[in-house]
């Protein structure tokens, strides 16, 4: 995810320059930074928070969809943090039997996504405030939600990741996919969330499910994890 300029308050909270000081929770800070991308870059991969190329964005969509175990059977999928709904564009270009729903905290992104895909379902919700009324889905994908942390300190970002994963996992019947920045890099950026394998695995394995797969075999300096309720083959 991309970035803005941040202002630190006397309480140690960080707010994007130009944003309301009330915007201080991790989810609202990250959402505000992404909305700045939307304003700056419009309907493009940069407007959705990707910094490299359209190809890298497309690669990530395929990685997210790789969580689906049986690609031949119908499945419902929640695109959590859907942004402009570009994953739905990808699904329309590469058809599969997937019932798509998009969800985002940002009203600006949801408004734009609904204009782009008027027949699709999009939900505007902050699930950390309340997930009441959010249906369950076969699969949930969280693409790019945890890559960027801006001025949020590491421990706060870690707790945010744990909290959001706990809530979202309640709403997947089969599995979910998420990505984070890798620690296996030449150098780390202070504004990105580089999550160690063992920290990730300890939480996922003890709090969510011991049935998970780590994908670290693609070009980006990140990794994708698939978490399943049941072991493979069942």
Language-model-derived ranges and their functions:
Residues 2-46:
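N-terminal, positively charged/glycine-rich alpha-helical extensions of SAM-dependent methyltransferases
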Residues 55-73:
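Conserved alpha-helix/loop element of class I SAM-dependent methyltransferases that forms part
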Residues 84-96:
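Conserved SAM-binding loop of SAM-dependent methyltransferases across substrates and taxa
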Residues 106:
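Conserved SAM/SAH-binding beta-strand->alpha-helix loop
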Residues 113-114:
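Conserved SAM-binding loop
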Residues 139-158:
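A short SAM/SAH-binding and catalytic strip from SAM-dependent methyltransferases
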């Amino acid at each position: 995810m991309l970035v803005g300029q941040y202002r630190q308050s006397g309480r140690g909270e960080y707010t994007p320059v130009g944003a309301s000081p009330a915007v201080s929770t991790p989810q609202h800070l990250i959402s505000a930074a992404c909305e700045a991308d939307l304003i700056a870059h419009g309907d493009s991969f940069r407007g959705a928070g990707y910094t490299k190329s359209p190809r890298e964005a497309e690669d990530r969509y395929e990685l997210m969809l790789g969580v689906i175990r049986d690609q031949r059977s119908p499945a419902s999928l929640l695109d959590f943090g859907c942004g402009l709904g570009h994953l739905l564009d990808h699904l329309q270009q590469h058809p599969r039997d997937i019932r798509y729903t998009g969800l985002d905290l940002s009203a600006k992104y949801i408004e734009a996504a609904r204009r782009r895909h008027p027949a699709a379902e999009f939900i505007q919700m902050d699930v950390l405030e309340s997930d009441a009324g959010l249906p369950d889905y076969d699969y949930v994908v969280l693409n790019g939600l945890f890559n960027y942390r801006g001025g949020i300190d590491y421990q706060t970002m870690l707790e945010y990741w744990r909290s959001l994963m706990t809530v979202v996992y309640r709403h997947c019947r089969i599995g979910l996919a998420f990505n984070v920045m890798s620690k296996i890099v030449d150098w780390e950026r202070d504004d990105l969330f580089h999550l160690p394998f063992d920290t990730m695995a300890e939480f996922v394995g003890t709090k969510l499910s011991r049935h998970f797969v780590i994908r670290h075999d693609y070009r980006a300096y990140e990794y994708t994890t698939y978490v399943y309720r049941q072991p493979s083959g069942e």
